[in-house]
Each structure stands twice: as structure tokens, then as C-alpha cells.
A protein has these predicted regions:
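Active-site-adjacent "subsite" loops/lids of carbohydrate-active enzymes
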Residues: 224-226, 237-240, 283, 310-361
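Catalytic domains of carbohydrate-active enzymes, especially glycoside hydrolases
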Residues: 244-267
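Polysaccharide-binding surfaces and accessory modules of carbohydrate-active proteins
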Residues: 1-159, 175
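Short Pro-Gly-centered flexible turn/kink motifs
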Residues: 179-198
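Acidic/aromatic-lined carbohydrate-recognition and catalytic surfaces
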Residues: 51, 267-322
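Short, structured beta-strand/loop micro-motifs enriched in basic residues and often containing a Trp
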Residues: 163-175
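Hydrophobic faces of well-ordered beta-strands that scaffold small-molecule active sites
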Residues: 189, 225-231, 258-262, 304-308
Length: 361
């Protein structure tokens, strides 16, 4: 079928044993060599089926072009990423990732998997959800991105004498995700984009950029990007006071900023990191209230902003022991989970949602 984007294919497969129907969606975009892929699973049987893994895209034979051995012609590009160390692309041979040939091509089927995985809603904390597979003999490049702001997984391995690539969102093994699919219920995988070009890594990125521009929803930011000043990075580093903010507001206004954001620390008399969660202004930092600074920001022709990290609560937050019980937080093995002196709020609890509403209101 054709639509506003281009051509769309839907391939339907059915498993008689489980009654599961899979629809593989392939949306092509006119003017690009990129296809958007995802899968829909429907339980058309009479029993509940537990889904532990759903691929968004799978392709076997990614190394077929050319006559050389896979390890002599294939390179896999990985985008390492971390806090303050971003977008570190590195290429590897198949031998370097443990996937060198070890048997006759017709018998090649190892247990080795080379994979990149993310667990949780920090979707790029170790890797960017992308990859590139380059065939240096054929001069071709296969590239992909997983369009997911949560858990995801991609893997490269060999089976049946060929190498395969699989892309997915969360799974049972990698991220403790599963879904009990009742009869007549459907579930949709995360979306991903896969493309192919003749040329180089740079050519692949050019093509992916064209695709990204096509799928980006229309919004005012496309035509006009606001100038925003935030007082945290390379500035106050979470130690704001009214005295410090006023000259910054003046400088930001003079520089032409349109928004001014007061970042972390405005709510804590002392060290702000582990006291976060109550979201009440510190009168020690702002004797006349944060509103005084916000009004001054408006007076200077800018829109004020205030930093909130509503999903966490520090272990020294006054609410932790006075109001909250364990049901407010993520727990593991019967105990609250905390990381770097903070608890993670569980928004399935209506009391947590009410707390968030009260903070904003």
C-alpha cells in the first residue's frame, strides 16, 4: 500500500502452536534508503501466551556480499556514550568482537553474540541506540537506530552459515520485561529504522539524517529555536542564591536569552543532592522567595523556569520518614532501591501521583 510517506509493506505470519499472529511492518520513505520497522503480535489462540522477546527487525545474511571471509571484510561500528563522554564511535572487526570464522561456512553456528543493550529510561547511558555494519569489500553499509527512550537491545551473531542482525526493545533476559498476552490482545514492539547505502560511514549518516528530518513532527521549534540560559552547567553547579541569580539574569537578558532556568539546589539549605523531593524553596537561599527572582526574570523580558526532578526523592528528604512508606518507592527483595543516595518514586501508587500534582499546583 502507499501512504503519505511512501510505500508500506505488512507481512503476516502465524504460529499454529501458540495461536500468535505477527505482523511485520515496513514503512518506506520516499527519497531515502531507510525503512521504519516494527512488529505487532496478536494472540488469536485460546490461552494466555507469555511474550519474553519481540524483535522489531531481523535480517539473516548481512555479510553475504563479496567473496572474502566475513572477518576479512566486515566492520561493526558502535557508538559508546556516557555522562560527559558522548558519541564515541568506534569500529571493530568481527574477530575483535569474538565472531571470527571457526568452522566451514555451512556449519558456522557459534554461541557467541555481540550485543549492545540498555536497561531503563536513560536510553543512552552507555551506548547510543544505533549501529553500523560496513562491508569493506562490497563498499556497502547497513545502519540502524532503535527509536526507544527506554530499554533496548541489538545483537549480531551467526546461525546457519550466515550472520544475522536483530533489533528490539526490552526483553526478559536483558531487561526483565515480559508480557502476558491474553486471547485477542495485541502488543506492538518499539520502532526502529534500518537503511543501506553504497559508500562510507559518513554517507550512511547523511541518509539517516534525511530520514530523521522526514519523521520529525512539525512544531514551532522547526522554524524558531528559543535561546535558553540554565544556571547549572559551568556556572552555579547546584548552589543558587538570590544574590547570585540577579547578576546572571542581567547578563542573560543582555545576551538576548528568552528563557532563564533556575536549576538544582533552590529547595535545600545545605547540600542539595540527597535532600531533593519536597520541592519547597529554601528561605536561606532565597530570603524573599524564589518568586522574587522569577519576577525579576520576567521584568527583564524573559520567561522563568524552575528545575524539577519529580521522579526521585533523596534519602535525607524530610518526607521519606514522615509521610512515605515503602509503597512509594521501587523495591527489590523487599527493600527500597536507592542509587547515589536517592529513591525512585513508583507512580503506580496514587499517593505518589497526588504528591506530584501538589508540587506542580
Amino acid at each position: 500500500m502507499n501512504n503519505d510517506y511512501g510505500r508500506k509493506l505488512e507481512l503476516v505470519t502465524f504460529d499454529k502452536g501458540t495461536g500468535l499472529e505477527a505482523v511485520s511492518h515496513y514503512q518506506f520513505y520516499t527519497g531515502t534508503s531507510v525503512v521504519r520497522c516494527w512488529t505487532t503480535l496478536t494472540n488469536k489462540g485460546s490461552e494466555v501466551q507469555t511474550i519474553e522477546y519481540m524483535s522489531s527487525f531481523a535480517l539473516t545474511g548481512v555479510e553475504k556480499e563479496g567473496l572474502k571471509k566475513p572477518e576479512d571484510k566486515m566492520k561493526i561500528w558502535v557508538c559508546h556514550n556516557s555522562w560527559q563522554r558522548e558519541l564515541q564511535w568506534q569500529d571493530y572487526t568481527l574477530e575483535q568482537v569474538g565472531l571470527a570464522s571457526s568452522a566451514k561456512p555451512t556449519e558456522q553456528r557459534s554461541s557467541k553474540v555481540f550485543a549492545c543493550t540498555n536497561v531503563g529510561n536513560w536510553s543512552a547511558k552507555e551506548y547510543i541506540p544505533m549501529g553500523v555494519l560496513e562491508n569493506t569489500e562490497a563498499g556497502s553499509v547497513l545502519f540502524w537506530q532503535i527509536e526507544q527512550n527506554g530499554s533496548w537491545h541489538w545483537e549480531l551473531s551467526d546461525v546457519g552459515g550466515h550472520f544475522y542482525l536483530q533489533l528490539s526493545g526490552p526483553s526478559e533476559i536483558e531487561s526483565h520485561w515480559y508480557k502476558n498476552l491474553v486471547p485477542n490482545e495485541s502488543i506492538e514492539s518499539v520502532k526502529c529504522a534500518v537503511g543501506s547505502v553504497t559508500g562510507s560511514f559518513d554517507k550512511a549518516m547523511d541518509e539517516l539524517t534525511k530520514y530523521r528530518r522526514k519523521i520529525r513532527r512539525r512544531n514551532k521549534d522547526n522554524q524558531r529555536l528559543a535561546v535558553i540560559f540554565n544556571d547549572y552547567m559551568n556556572c552555579l553547579w547546584g548552589d543558587p542564591t538570590a544574590e547570585k541569580e540577579f547578576p546572571l539574569v542581567d547578563a542573560a537578558a543582555e545576551a538576548g536569552c528568552e528563557y532563564f532556568c533556575i536549576d538544582a539546589g533552590w529547595y535545600a539549605d545545605g547540600f542539595w543532592w540527597d535532600e531533593v523531593g519536597e520541592w519547597k524553596e529554601s528561605r536561606k537561599r532565597f530570603p524573599n522567595g524564589v518568586k522574587e527572582v522569577a519576577d525579576y526574570i520576567r521584568k527583564k523580558g524573559m520567561i522563568p523556569g524552575l528545575w524539577l526532578e519529580i521522579e526521585v526523592m533523596g534519602i535525607k528528604c524530610p518526607l521519606v520518614d514522615s509521610v512515605c512508606d515503602d509503597s512509594w518507592f521501587f523495591t527489590r527483595h523487599g527493600k527500597r532501591v536507592y542509587d547515589r543516595s536517592r529513591y525512585q518514586l513508583d507512580f503506580r501508587n496514587p499517593k505518589v501521583r497526588s504528591h506530584a500534582d501538589e508540587v506542580i499546583d
